[in-house]
Amino acid sequence: MFIINLLLYIVPILLAVAFLTLVERKVLGYMQFRKGPNIVGPYGLLQPIADGIKLFTKEPLRPLTSSVSMFIIAPILALTLALTIWTPLPMPHTLIDLNLGLLFILSLSGLSVYSILWSGWASNSKYALIGALRAVAQTISYEVTLAIILLSIMLINGSFTLKNLLITQENMWLIVSTWPLAMMWYISTLAETNRAPFDLTEGESELVSGFNVEYAAGPFAMFFLAEYANIMAMNAMTAILFLGSSLNHNFSHLSTLSFMLKTLFLTFMFLWIRASYPRFRYDQLMYLLWKNFLPLTLALCLWFISIPIALSCIPPQI
């Protein structure tokens, strides 16, 4: 029974990820005054299936000088972590109900750094290694602000449990009272998932494709699926943290629909930002985090610690 539950959880995520690539190409196409994919199937709807078949039936090539085991393990690890992040998310029911759900997600997003580093190092290519080092530095840096923002949310919530966030936001979304945190969280998730305007890891003009430049066929598809699964997971997290369900829990179907619509809207914003903004310089990226976001998040964290204590309204410890 657990295997069936697992498949019912993983297959829709992979399908959503596949069609997200189509939505991205369509959105970017229309924003650049062109059609996007429109040949394979009606309105190009079968394009992701054609892409998947093409990638998984090709011969997986690897450089002669690469480290074989690490080269193969890296994409598998990336996809496994990207799918595991979804397990504690309440939609409104979870696959695994964890007391420390927020910490679990944070630690898994930290582990994804290893798959990037291994892929860059195992490829034995200078472009892949430079892309991997950039990605690791960027991901580790922005995890600092993500962790502090999560700590602030936990102080308001009174617990690390994700389901408790839905109860906290029954009357009012947290984005209303914590909009500076929400803004910094959203920008940090863009950097964490290596999306435009922070896609310095795969700068086409300098690094061709970044850390996965030597990958082809199935392993490349795994990295691709992992990247888009992470994007959707981060947007699902944003929806839970700041736009939590304000519906009655007796109507779980409506709650799920509301949650998915919020996630889709946030994902569409990712695509809109990609079409609108040019890439940051690397020094600007780091300056934004260490000089702007970090002091602000620390100050707001202190604010959320001191105000409940000063007003004697400490949140309930569940």
Swiss-Prot record:
Pfam families: NADHdh. It is found in: Mitochondrion inner membrane. Its EC number is 7.1.1.2. GO terms for biological process: mitochondrial electron transport, NADH to ubiquinone; mitochondrial respiratory chain complex I assembly. It is an enzyme of class 7 (translocase). It catalyses: a ubiquinone + NADH + 5 H(+)(in) = a ubiquinol + NAD(+) + 4 H(+)(out). The chain crosses the membrane at residues 2-22, 70-90, 100-120, 136-156, 172-192, 223-243, 253-273, 294-314. GO terms for molecular function: NADH dehydrogenase (ubiquinone) activity. Its main location: mitochondrion. InterPro entries: NADH_UbQ_OxRdtase_su1/FPO, NADH_UbQ_OxRdtase_su1_CS. Keywords: Electron transport, Membrane, Mitochondrion, Mitochondrion inner membrane, NAD, Respiratory chain, Translocase, Transmembrane, Transmembrane helix, Transport, Ubiquinone. GO terms for cellular component: mitochondrial inner membrane. The keyword Transport applies. It is a multi-pass membrane protein. Core subunit of respiratory chain NADH dehydrogenase (Complex I) which is composed of 45 different subunits. Belongs to the complex I subunit 1 family. Core subunit of the mitochondrial membrane respiratory chain NADH dehydrogenase (Complex I) which catalyzes electron transfer from NADH through the respiratory chain, using ubiquinone as an electron acceptor. Essential for the catalytic activity and assembly of complex I. HAMAP family: NDH1_NuoH. This is NADH-ubiquinone oxidoreductase chain 1. It comes from Osphranter rufus (Red kangaroo). The lineage of its organism: Eukaryota, Metazoa, Chordata, Craniata, Vertebrata. The gene is MT-ND1.
